[in-house]
Amino acid sequence: MEYTAGKYDVIVVGGGHAGCEAALASARLGCRTLLLTLSIDFVALMPCNPAIGGPGKSHLVREIDALGGEMGRNTDRAAIQVRMLNTGKGPAVRALRAQTDKRLYQEGMRRTVEGQPLLDLKQAMVEKIIVDGGSARGVVTRTGARFLAPAVIVTTGTYLRSRVLVGETSFESGPNGQFPAVGLAANLRENGFELGRFKTGTPPRIDRRTLDFSRMTPQHGDEDCPGFSFAAGNRGKEQIQVPCWLTYTTARTHEIIRENLDRSPLYTGIIQGTGPRYCPSIEDKVVRFADRERHQVFVEPEGLHTNEMYVQGMSTSLPEDVQLLLLRSLPGLEKVEIVRYGYAIEYDYVVPTQLAPTLETKAVSGLFLAGQINGTSGYEEAAAQGIVAGINAAQSVKNGEPLVVSRAQAYIGVLIDDLVTKGTREPYRIFTSRAEYRLALRQDNADLRLTERAHRIGLVSGAHYERFAQKKDRVRAELERLDRTVVPDPLGRVSRAEVQDWLAARGSAPLSRPCRLSELLRRPEIRYADLVGLGVADPDVAPDVAAEVENQIKYAGYIQKQAAQVARFEKLEARRIPADLDYSEVRGLSNEAAQKLAEIRPVSVGQAGRISGVSPADIAVLLVYLEKRRRREEESDGSRIGHLPSERSGELGSGTG
């Protein structure tokens, strides 16, 4: 029997990375919010790798932080090793990666959720979305509790009709032995949503006391590394850093896999879901890359106070006895004991082209989806969708302007645009290569790109916004100073001889004339820190300010070129397409284009052009049609204005009062 258990402004279903960001954003925007999760002990669970960040992913985390989200701050508190990746490459692809203590991460996020005003955390399994008149009205739990709200966000991760597979064994289960969400999957189908089926997996966890670290190569973190959060500044240098360890598969490893492929659900046809291309299982790697003699395997700590180690690169669904044989074939793991066995997990997802760029579903107003339910993989991708869904659900309740981030503004925009415009046939993972304007979308300038928008919405304020405003002012002031300061100094504080010697020491060409510091800094061999040695830079400039200044100066030409490309992109994005447009009336469109456009219903000409099957010729036809429609509407409006009744003619009313 159903009963009304509570009324809220926004309800979030699922307490993973997407759900936490969504619920926090909604509550921080003043909406009374309910977060329902299968187990409050598993809030912000990290069921797979104990790490945050990496190429593309660190950009998302910085953007979440710039919007006022929690993942960056929580990662900084829970980090046990931090490294900057791709330091030998340009700033567009440099990426921060943090090894985290899983328990610290979970506990920190749960404390934040429980301490957030206007946010209630409750344990329950949701089985039904209440839909009335095409709008979401709330949810119903397995026990019949009805929670009502005009906005619902579903962030169920990999739990929708999930099934775990190990060798020949399979059973209904979510990650880490949790319940699967079977009823909710059926309810989404009943509400007309198209669902697909994906697969992912996780490697075994092993006991560190059974490892021989002398046979592996240590991988240490960076000593002076920034944190993910702009608000918190640099990580505390007192935080403990622990090593990860590198080993490799062997010929024996590959032999064991090939001998047991007939016991792998991946190759026996038991697994039906599509797996992630960029995170394949070890058996898949050995088969697909048969010419490779070995594959890297990283042994990573799961926390400071546990003996569990994560074996990155060994995701598998092979039987348990085979998993042990595999691991014991690796150098350093000859006597290893497994604490938790690896497994594959199949789950349903909602085809994401059924969503608007706000992450609201097109079929049911007030219903938002975020995270792996939309076909993505990864904690960071989930959290990024979560904060956008949380903001937009709150804004819809408050009748505020929605937040739509374009692919020219953020990796979050790239992620969401790819999902809602192109869809995905495999678990979607973000990469820097997916962003056309990546030089403008660096991880170091996420705050300069997004924090002002978050401040206008009301998500960023106080010390966080003050720090951002100060950084912005300091960057501008330092850019202006470097542009007006000349060396050799006309006042003689830095002589010509000093400058030439300084340049020679750095292998840089001598000056033939006085030169602005900004020109000097454009030279690839000159760094901002070098200017301090010359006595022409402020040694107290914060590292984040110095990095931003250096990047803006060194890559000014490329950034300007990309800005011109962005301007063209935004021009097409500004050409809006009426929501009621009947594409069957647009003569000249190919049949495929008309079908795809009607199915996805893009909001702009720019988005239409990114739909698979829509050609440049189709876009040209669409532009002509939209222009003709605009002119007809203008003429119609003008005609109506010309026939408005006038007071002089007495047509506005002839009553005598």
From Swiss-Prot:
Presence of the UniProt keyword NAD in the record: yes
Xref: Gene3D superfamilies: FAD/NAD(P)-binding domain, GidA associated domain, C-terminal subdomain, tRNA uridine 5-carboxymethylaminomethyl modification enzyme MnmG/GidA
Cellular component, GO annotation: cytosol
Top-rank taxon, per record: Bacteria
PROSITE patterns the UniProt entry points to: GIDA_1, GIDA_2
Compositional bias (Basic and acidic residues): 632-650
Known cofactor(s): FAD
Family: Belongs to the MnmG family.
Gene Ontology molecular-function annotations: flavin adenine dinucleotide binding
InterPro entries associated with the record: FAD/NAD-bd_sf, GIDA_C_N, MnmG, MnmG-rel, MnmG-rel_CS, MnmG_C, MnmG_C_subdom, MnmG_C_subdom_sf
Name listed for the protein in its UniProt record: tRNA uridine 5-carboxymethylaminomethyl modification enzyme MnmG
GO biological process, one term: tRNA methylation
Pfam families: GIDA (PF01134), GIDA_C_1st (PF21680), SAM_GIDA_C (PF13932)
